[in-house]
Curated annotation (Swiss-Prot):
Annotated family: Belongs to the conotoxin P superfamily.
GO cellular component terms given for this protein: extracellular region
Bridged cysteine pairs (disulfide): C62-C76, C66-C78, C72-C83
Protein name listed in UniProt: Conotoxin tx9a
One Pfam family linked to the record: Toxin_11
Amino acid sequence: MHLSLARSAVLMLLLLFALGNFVVVQSGQITRDVDNGQLTDNRRNLQSKWKPVSLYMSRRGCNNSCQEHSDCESHCICTFRGCGAVNG
């Protein structure tokens, strides 16, 4: 009984050590903001700027000028000529 308990403890320690090596925070990526002391993440924002596209084509108009997709209505995209309807 004592031998199997010792083996289980050793196995658990080995698993903790092995799994602990996978969870590593890379240095320099999370820093503390000097002004307010909050933690900040210096990695790029991975949130996509793409908008979901509906299969239903809207007949509503679009804004005329844009710099990026978020400047246009939800059913429009930003092109080199300005906002334009998706598939239209």
